[in-house]
């Protein structure tokens, strides 16, 4: 046994200086160093004692290192540590044991936000919570009597001239599409027109001058419905005064502006939004030629209304609102006037004024019937030229042209009862239209032809008489 201890001391020679660093720290190390030095110098200490001291010192260092982490259980650790030191067994501090520990390691948590109140973070109270009415403290130094019972209202600034035109132009253009005067009135009430109320009729009439007859009729209805709700009769009078003043400029874009403005004035007087003495107030005071022409037109229309003509028919009823019988009469008059004057452009203009592109097949039908009923070549050639012009200008579409010819093909047996030579005339006219490019080859081939009668004078040789039947 003594031999083994001597070998251990020889293998692990102990340096007194280094022993103090490896065994202890602080005051305990200093005290232990002095004792060990004395013991070593006395040559009576054993190797097992030195190994046990090393183990105990190492266990103490581990306990001190983990003391900051295990601050919450310092008493138990210190107790365990003292027991470990006495027993010579180290406290298990393996990494696996620390992973299974669910307590905080740094005292700051995992860095997640804390729950902020009953409704959670960023939520004001629980769902469905009703807040009390905030009571005003009279003793508050910032209390103001004017703040009690305040009623807040949205203030809309009045429109200037530029904003007025930009805002109202799309409103009136949309009105030409839907025709609802109530919707326009509601939109105008939301705007602060101020002194620009008289500009509404001016802008509406200016846009209607560039439109169709149906647009002018809708404008007259709009002015009649807005008067008394959005604007007054004085505003209407101011607007027509401005229109008469601006007629020279309006006539540059619309040459018929004086006559159209005169019709607007006559319609306004008939609707009761202009006084009957409005035209008389301008007598002898007008120097502008266009304004005088407008007033003269209004005077003529008003005088005609006294004889029985209604003032609400100055624009007629445009588009599909017209009855079919009325459209048939208008087209018949259009063709008769064309055969008398021969003016293709005027006939085309009158057809567009009817605003019934879905009814153009009636013109094709009536025109061909006139050709079948005519006795000379002039009507044949004039109707051919008219259809050719309307086809090239795309006034009459291919569908309307086809439908008009198909109506003739279906009714030719009845027409032939009144016009005996209708089949031969129709075949000739259809062939001429095909040569002019008005109809297609398929439509030409659909033209019906009546079987020719066999005359008694025809012999077995099959010779035909020179005249055709």
From Swiss-Prot:
Residues 114-125 have a biased composition (Gly residues). The modification Phosphotyrosine is found at residue 152. One of its GO terms (cellular component) is cytosol. The modification N-acetylmethionine is found at residue 1. Pfam families: MA3. The keyword Signal does not apply. Polyubiquitinated, leading to its proteasomal degradation. Rapidly degraded in response to mitogens. Phosphorylation of the phosphodegron promotes interaction with BTRC and proteasomal degradation. A motif (Phosphodegron) lies at residues 70-76. Expressed ubiquitously. Highyly expressed in thymus and liver. Moderately expressed in brain, kidney and spleen; weakly in lung and heart. Expression is up- or down-regulated in response to apoptosis inducers. Regulated by many programmed cell death-inducing stimuli. Changing residue 414 to A: Strongly reduced interaction with EIF4A1. Gene3D superfamilies: 1.25.40.180. The modification Phosphoserine is found at residues 25, 67-68, 71, 76, 78, 94, 313, 317, 457. The keyword Signal does not apply. One of its GO terms (molecular function) is RNA binding. Keywords: Acetylation, Apoptosis, Cytoplasm, Nucleus, Phosphoprotein, Repeat, RNA-binding, Tumor suppressor, Ubl conjugation. PROSITE patterns: MI. It comes from the Eukaryota. Residues 163-284, 326-449 form the MI domain. A motif (Nuclear localization signal) lies at residues 58-64, 448-454. Belongs to the PDCD4 family. Inhibits translation initiation and cap-dependent translation. May excert its function by hindering the interaction between EIF4A1 and EIF4G. Inhibits the helicase activity of EIF4A. Modulates the activation of JUN kinase. Down-regulates the expression of MAP4K1, thus inhibiting events important in driving invasion, namely, MAPK85 activation and consequent JUN-dependent transcription. May play a role in apoptosis. Tumor suppressor. Inhibits tumor promoter-induced neoplastic transformation. Binds RNA. Interacts (via MI domains) with EIF4A1 and EIF4A2 (via N-terminal domain). Heterotrimer with EIF4A1; one molecule of PDCD4 binds two molecules of EIF4A1. Interacts with EIF4G1. May form a complex with EIF4A1 and EIF4G1. The interaction between PDCD4 and EIF4A1 interferes with the interaction between EIF4A1 and EIF4G. When phosphorylated, interacts with BTRC and FBXW11. Binds EIF4A1 via both MI domains. It is linked to Decreases benign tumor development and malignant progression. This is Programmed cell death protein 4.
